[in-house]
C-alpha cells in the first residue's frame, strides 16, 4: 500500500498552531487543511480565529468556512472530507493538518465508530424518562437490549446509559454492534507535532486574543450571523464566543460578563484539548518559540 506523508500540527486553542503551520507550509511548499471543528463554519471568521484573506492568498487553505452554521458535522464526515483533500494534494504538496479537534484526527488516521446523529426529539424523550423513572429503570432496559455494553459500565453512569439507549432506539442497533463497525484508517505516515505551553502562561494569551477579537468586530459578526440564521436551527453549533456574545446582545448580561464567560469557557476548552493530546504518545511536543527545532524535526522526517 502507498502511504502518503502527512504532518499534523496539534495543541490547545490560541497557542500558535496556525502561525507555525503557515511558516512550515511556506518553507516546504505545503498546503494547510483545517482540523478544527469551529473553523469549518462560514460567517464567524473572527470568533473562530480563521486564517486571514492575505494568508489564504499566499498558502492554499482547505476546509475553512465550508459549512453553514445549521449544517451538522461529525468526525466521520470530516475524515471523509479530509481524505478527499489528501488524495488530491499528497502527490504534489506536503499536507499540514492543523487544529485542536483530536477526535477528527483519530477518525482519519486510527478509524472511528460512526454512529448516525440522534434526533433532538428522541434525546429529550430519553432525558424525560430518566427524570421520571430514574436511571436504574433505564439501566435495566439497557441490560435487556444490550447486555454486553450494560455489563461494561456502572449502573449509575447516566450519560453512558442514556447514550447507549438513544443509539439503540434511533438505529435499531446496539452500542456493542456499533463499536465493532470501526472505519478504515487513512493510509498515511504521519508526523504529529504538538505545540503547548503551561496553562498558566496560555491564559493571558487567550485573554489578549479575545480582546483583539472584540476590536476586530466580534460583536457585529455575531449580530449579523444571528440575524441571518434566526429562523434556522443552529443550536447544534456550540462555537465558543458565539453563545457568550449572543447572551449579551440579547441583554441577558453585560459585554464584560460575556468576555469573562468567553475566557472561562476557552480556558476550559484548552484544558480539555491538552488532556486529549497528552494521552497520545506519538506526538512530539514543542513550545511555540522552538521554530528551528520544529523545522529540524520536519526535515529529518521528510528525509
Swiss-Prot record:
Molecular function terms, GO-annotated: ATP binding; tRNA dimethylallyltransferase activity
Which residues are listed under the site Interaction with substrate tRNA? Answer: 101
UniProt-listed GO biological process terms: tRNA modification
Query: Where substrate is bound, by residue?
Result: 13-18
Q: Which reaction does it catalyse?
A: adenosine(37) in tRNA + dimethylallyl diphosphate = N(6)-dimethylallyladenosine(37) in tRNA + diphosphate
Q: What class of enzyme is it?
A: transferase
Per its UniProt record, the required cofactor names are: Mg(2+)
Q: Does the keyword Ribonucleoprotein apply?
A: no
What UniProt keywords are attached to this protein's entry?
ATP-binding, Magnesium, Nucleotide-binding, Transferase, tRNA processing
Which residues hold ATP? 11-18
| UniProt cross-references to InterPro entries, sorted A to Z | Dimethylallyltransferase (IPR039657), IPT (IPR018022), P-loop_NTPase (IPR027417)
Query: What EC number is given for this enzyme?
Result: 2.5.1.75
Query: Where are the residues of the annotated region Interaction with substrate tRNA?
Result: 36-39, 159-163
- HAMAP family named in the record: IPP_trans
What is the similarity comment for this entry? Belongs to the IPP transferase family.
Provide the assembly information.
Answer: Monomer.
Instruction: Tell me the function of this protein.
Output: Catalyzes the transfer of a dimethylallyl group onto the adenine at position 37 in tRNAs that read codons beginning with uridine, leading to the formation of N6-(dimethylallyl)adenosine (i(6)A).
| Listed name of the protein | tRNA dimethylallyltransferase
Provide the species name: Lawsonia intracellularis (strain PHE/MN1-00)
Amino acid at each position: 500500500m502507498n502511504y502518503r506523508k502527512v504532518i499534523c500540527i496539534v495543541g490547545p486553542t490560541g497557542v500558535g498552531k496556525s502561525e507555525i503551520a503557515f511558516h512550515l507550509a511556506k518553507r516546504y511548499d505545503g498546503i494547510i487543511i483545517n482540523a478544527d471543528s469551529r473553523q469549518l463554519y462560514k460567517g464567524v471568521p473572527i470568533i473562530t480565529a480563521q486564517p486571514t484573506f492575505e494568508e489564504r492568498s499566499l498558502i492554499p487553505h482547505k476546509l475553512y468556512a465550508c459549512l453553514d452554521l445549521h449544517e451538522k458535522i461529525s468526525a466521520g464526515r470530516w475524515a471523509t472530507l479530509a481524505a478527499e483533500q489528501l488524495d488530491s494534494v499528497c502527490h504534489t504538496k506536503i499536507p499540514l493538518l492543523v487544529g485542536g479537534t483530536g477526535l477528527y484526527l483519530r477518525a482519519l488516521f486510527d478509524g472511528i465508530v460512526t454512529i448516525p446523529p440522534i434526533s433532538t426529539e428522541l434525546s429529550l424523550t430519553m432525558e424525560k424518562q430518566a427524570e421520571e423513572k430514574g436511571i436504574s429503570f433505564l439501566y435495566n432496559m439497557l441490560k435487556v437490549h444490550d447486555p454486553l455494553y450494560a455489563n461494561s459500565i456502572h449502573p449509575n453512569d447516566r450519560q453512558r446509559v442514556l447514550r447507549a439507549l438513544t443509539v439503540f432506539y434511533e438505529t435499531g442497533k446496539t452500542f456493542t454492534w456499533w463499536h465493532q463497525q470501526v472505519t478504515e484508517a487513512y493510509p498515511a505516515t504521519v508526523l504529529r507535532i504538538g505545540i503547548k505551553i503551561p496553562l498558566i502562561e496560555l491564559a493571558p494569551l487567550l485573554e489578549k486574543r479575545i480582546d483583539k477579537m472584540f476590536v476586530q468586530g466580534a460583536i457585529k459578526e455575531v449580530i449579523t450571523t444571528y440575524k441571518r440564521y434566526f429562523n434556522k436551527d443552529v443550536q447544534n453549533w456550540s462555537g465558543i464566543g458565539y453563545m457568550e456574545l449572543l447572551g449579551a446582545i440579547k441583554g441577558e448580561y453585560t459585554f464584560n460578563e460575556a468576555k469573562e464567560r468567553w475566557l472561562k469557557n476557552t480556558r476550559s476548552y484548552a484544558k480539555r484539548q491538552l488532556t486529549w493530546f497528552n494521552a497520545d504518545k506519538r506526538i512530539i511536543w514543542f513550545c511555540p518559540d522552538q521554530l528551528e527545532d520544529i523545522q529540524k524535526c520536519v526535515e529529518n522526517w521528510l528525509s
